[in-house]
Amino acid sequence: AQALKGIIDACYFKPTIVNVVDSVKVVNPIMYKSFGYRALYHDMSAGLNNVTALSQIEYLIKFHFEWNYNRPDLVHDRNMKKHESIMERSLKKGGRRDVFLGVREFIGDVEYIDEYRFTTCRTAYDGSSIDFGYMFHHFNYPNNNQKKFKSIFAKVKMESGIINFDLDGVEYIEN
């Protein structure tokens, strides 16, 4: 969920809001490809890098935003229609900043979809269930109420291509 939140934050981020990922739909089959490329270093020498990366990636991300209550100084900016409109315009234009899928060499594209497309889009995993076990879910950053930085790992299951990120009723570990 943290990586998907990074994609959404690249499209529109303000300290007034916190983007929350609800679910992701994995449209294409999960496939990998390996390849090598020559990297040019800052001292103008070159090296060979070998990479294994996901290929043919297509995710549909369902999310919402909430007010950042850790910033009471921004209460005057809590206008739901304003932020919804800016987010929608940003998504329709492909986001505000480049989206990276892991590292800078893997740039992603963003486009706006509506609820109808999210629910009707077929996936390679329709009718199947895959248990991924425990996976990294998100970070809990220190704030006024919590003093420690925590990593959250949750038991992740994909049902018909959809992974839900709501932790209610889901087994998770805090580290």
Regions found by a protein language model. Name each.
Residues 37-175:
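Internal, well-folded beta-alpha domain core
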Residues 1-41:
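Long, hydrophobic N-terminal alpha-helical segment
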